[in-house]
A protein has these predicted regions:
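Short beta-strand-to-loop acidic/aromatic patch adjacent to the donor-nucleotide binding site
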Residues: 80-91
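Conserved sequence signature across two-component system core domains
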Residues: 10-11, 34-36, 58
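Conserved donor nucleotide-binding strand/loop of the catalytic core
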Residues: 32, 43-78
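Short, well-formed alpha-helical segments that are part of the catalytic scaffolds
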Residues: 11-27
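A conserved acidic beta->alpha catalytic loop
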Residues: 35-44, 90
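Acceptor/aglycone-binding surface of glycosyltransferases and processive sugar-polymer synthases
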Residues: 60-74, 82, 94-171
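Acidic helix N-cap motif at the loop->helix transition within catalytic regions
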Residues: 15-19, 40-48, 95
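Cell-envelope/extracellular polymer assembly enzymes that use nucleotide-activated donors
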Residues: 3-5, 30
């Protein structure tokens, strides 16, 4: 039986973190927030949220990769089999969480990548170019066409991460 949580890595997202958590709670009550050394009011906001969220904090910013690995380790320690990651800046819609869960039913060992609206009016020009180039390069190397390879909105099968040799924690 799948046991699913949502991991929210955050760094200085005081203006959006509460809303993101409230939106996620509508679809999943198992939430792990990793506070990656925020220097704004993020930590205080997380402490003020009455819901039973798991919060992992550390004092220095280590990078999103480190925050994700920390969240995955916490999720595994709590007995979760799968984790959905969602960015804390509000660019992903929590109401897509059921789509990830439905996709998991069809591919229980899978890896699912969500897709943002990458139109130029929704994203700075340099980000649009970088994402298009990344998508092109991914397609060239794998033959697989993914519209948003850089999306932080993903579902991971936690057992598949065992032994993964990550070469950097900052991205």
């Amino acid at each position: 039986m799948e046991k699913i949580c949502v991991i929210i890595p955050t760094y200085n997202n005081a203006t959006t973190i509460r809303r993101v958590i409230e939106d996620v709670e509508k679809y999943c009550s198992s939430i792990i927030v990793v506070n990656d050394g925020s220097t704004d009011d993020t930590a205080a906001i997380l402490q003020s949220i009455p819901s039973p969220i798991e919060v992992v904090s550390y004092p220095d910013n280590r990078g999103k990769g480190y925050a994700l690995v920390t969240g995955f380790k916490k999720a595994k320690a709590l007995g979760y089999t799968h984790a959905i990651t969602i960015d804390a800046d509000g660019q992903h819609f929590a109401d897509d969480i059921p789509c990830f869960i439905e996709g998991l039913k069809h591919n229980p060992e899978g890896f699912i990548v969500g897709c943002r609206n990458l139109t130029e009016e929704n994203m700075p020009r340099q980000n649009t170019f970088a994402n298009r180039f990344s998508n092109f390069w991914f397609r060239l190397q794998t033959g697989i066409n993914l519209p948003d390879t850089q999306s932080g909105y993903r579902l991971y099968t936690l057992s598949s991460l065992k032994g993964l040799n990550l070469i950097t924690s900052r991205y």
